[in-house]
């Protein structure tokens, strides 16, 4: 009897080895099943009639204790079947991003997990294109595990969606002489490594990976386009509402903010043990207190904490590399919303901004001579009238629209891969959670339409023509993810042909009901002015906080 048992064990071992060889180090346990075997262990997900989803897959070791303020480390293998039916905590933050944009399960330093949405019928040999979504939130808020970014719609269109988390704020970007300040960015790189290692288990094609980000997520995508660390780990890119002009932090600026933070929390800048002794609650409280000081660039207020240009992980400012033609040459979509800056201006200035204050802001931002040129295009309103509307238009152009146009123009000249541009102009019906955005197309307005989560995440009841618009919008993105062409003839139906901008054509797609195709580059004196001033090239006497004259 014992010999028979031993023989059965040996035969079973051969079967396991055979299966492992068939699928590499990993393989799906039963086709159509809810369990998969990853490189680090097995995980059980949820199966529905239309798709499968695996929540809370670890792509790095928890960055806690001695791993706080360290580059991400590979996860430890596990020997049990991990529960992937529930979302994990978002990274430490005080999320105020609005309905549907924050996690419903809490926060933790143990947050380096990703969620995978898969078409129901795929198997390990399907070679389905993959979209990795990097959420925004000024590098201090945001999570891939929220209702807004549910990947069901993409999965139903035969795209695998991977939503990632990464460390935020101080915990993600504290830069000292000893610390790079790029932990959050390297978390994203490790997530891309995980995709290369594991996505075939889910039926994905590791050679067809699109990275897609919005706002700070788009700036992250721009950094990946500029980083040797990310080369070859993605093959297409989508950047929505990229605040290029804000810039990533230089090491000098990043260390300045780190020094102030260290003083407030009671640690020497280089005393990492002291920093590791502080609770997440203490860190978050001091982080929220920290603002600009005399000598800081005004635009640093948008992202006090961000990836750092260190010459190793992030080689240079993305817009500088775009100008030089040295970014990774991959098919790209880039675009922005009609009223991007309204949200930021009205959240910062809750009361009327009088014209004299507006003029001072422009002069501080651009210097007096260049500021006067800017005021010719964005003139002062009437006496004592509110300047916030014109300030919003200026910042929409200067932070988002014009540098986006610059990116498209330079890449079309330097790269072989196609680049597509859009302008999103569809007002979100059913109201906006922020009063100043009512009837406008604010930052982030496109997201519930692209993901088709307007009902599930925002409880919006759209008109039939708006639902059709959202369907068509998603089709453009799906076609690009599959074919590098949003209007590919073999793709899903779209109402207009969206051609790339090239060395000789300047096409842009206006995203609103009916869609329109228009010229992007020419006849735009406002952007021409900002191009001539540059977006990151101000002297030390400009664009900085100053002491007010008595």
UniProtKB/Swiss-Prot annotation:
Gene3D superfamilies: alpha/beta hydrolase. The keyword Disulfide bond applies. It comes from the Eukaryota. GO terms for biological process: endocytosis; mitotic cytokinesis; sorocarp development. The keyword Hydrolase applies. SUPFAM superfamilies: alpha/beta-Hydrolases. Keywords: Cytoplasmic vesicle, Disulfide bond, Glycoprotein, Hydrolase, Membrane, Serine esterase, Signal. InterPro entries: AB_hydrolase_fold (IPR029058), CarbesteraseB (IPR002018), Carboxylesterase_B_AS (IPR019826), Carboxylesterase_B_CS (IPR019819). Residues 1-19 form the signal peptide. Disulfide bonds join 91-111, 267-274. GO terms for molecular function: carboxylic ester hydrolase activity; hydrolase activity, acting on ester bonds. It is found in: Cytoplasmic vesicle, Esterosome membrane. GO terms for cellular component: early phagosome; esterosome membrane; extracellular matrix; lysosome. The active site is at 215 (acyl-ester intermediate), 340 (charge relay system), 443 (charge relay system). Glycans are attached at residues 156, 506. Its main location: membrane. Belongs to the type-B carboxylesterase/lipase family. PANTHER family: CARBOXYLIC ESTER HYDROLASE. This is Crystal protein.
């Amino acid at each position: 009897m014992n010999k028979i048992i031993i023989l059965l064990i040996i035969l079973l071992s051969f079967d396991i080895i055979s299966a492992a060889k068939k699928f590499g180090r990993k393989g799906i346990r039963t086709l159509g099943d809810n369990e998969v075997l990853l490189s680090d262990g097995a995980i059980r997900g949820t199966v529905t009639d239309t798709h499968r989803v695996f929540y809370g897959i670890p792509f790095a070791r928890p960055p806690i204790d001695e791993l706080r303020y360290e580059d991400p480390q590979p996860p430890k293998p596990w020997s049990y079947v991990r529960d992937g039916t529930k979302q994990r905590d978002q990274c430490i933050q005080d999320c105020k991003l609005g309905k549907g944009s924050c996690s419903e399960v809490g926060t933790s330093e143990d947050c380096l997990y990703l969620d995978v949405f898969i078409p129901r019928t795929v198997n390990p040999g399907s070679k389905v294109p993959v979209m990795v979504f990097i959420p925004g939130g000024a590098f201090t808020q945001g999570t891939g595990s929220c209702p807004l970014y549910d990947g069901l719609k993409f999965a139903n269109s035969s795209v695998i969606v991977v939503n990632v988390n990464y460390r935020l704020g101080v915990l993600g970007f504290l830069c000292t002489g000893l610390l790079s300040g790029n932990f959050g960015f390297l978390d994203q790189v490790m997530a891309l490594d995980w995709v290369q290692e594991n996505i075939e288990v889910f039926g994905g094609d590791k050679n067809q990976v699109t990275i897609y980000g919005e706002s700070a997520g788009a700036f992250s995508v721009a950094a990946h386009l500029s980083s040797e660390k990310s080369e070859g780990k993605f093959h297409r890119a989508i950047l929505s509402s990229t605040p290029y002009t804000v810039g990533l932090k230089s090491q000098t600026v990043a260390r300045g903010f780190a020094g102030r933070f260290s003083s407030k929390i009671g640690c020497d800048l280089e005393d990492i043990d002291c920093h590791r002794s502080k609770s997440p609650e203490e860190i978050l409280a001091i982080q929220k207190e920290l603002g600009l000081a005399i000598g800081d660039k005004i635009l640093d207020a948008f992202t006090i904490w961000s990836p750092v240009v260190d010459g190793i992980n992030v080689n240079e400012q993305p817009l500088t590399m775009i100008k030089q033609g040295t970014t990774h040459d991959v098919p790209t979509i880039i675009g922005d919303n009609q009223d991007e800056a309204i949200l930021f201006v009205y959240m910062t200035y809750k009361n009327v901004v009088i014209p004299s204050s507006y003029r001072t802001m422009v002069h501080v931002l651009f210097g007096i001579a260049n500021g006067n040129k800017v005021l010719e295009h964005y003139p002062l309103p009437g006496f004592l009238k509110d300047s916030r509307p014109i300030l919003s238009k200026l910042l929409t152009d200067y932070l988002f629209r014009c540098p986006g146009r610059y990116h498209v123009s330079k890449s079309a000249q330097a790269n072989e891969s196609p680049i597509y541009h859009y302008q999103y102009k569809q007002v979100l019906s059913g109201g906006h959670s922020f009063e100043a955005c009512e009837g406008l197309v604010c930052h982030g307005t496109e997201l519930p339409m692209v993901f088709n989560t307007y009902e599930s995440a925002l409880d919006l009841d759209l008109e039939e023509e708006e639902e059709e618009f959202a369907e068509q919008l998603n089709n453009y993105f799906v076609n690009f993810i599959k074919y590098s062409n949003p209007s590919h003839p073999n793709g899903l139906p779209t109402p207009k042909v969206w051609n790339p901008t090239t060395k000789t054509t300047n096409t842009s797609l206006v995203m609103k009901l009916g869609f329109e195709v228009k010229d992007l580059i020419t006849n735009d004196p406002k952007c021409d002015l900002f191009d001539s001033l540059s977006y990151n090239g101000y002297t030390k006497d400009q664009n900085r906080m100053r002491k007010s004259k008595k």
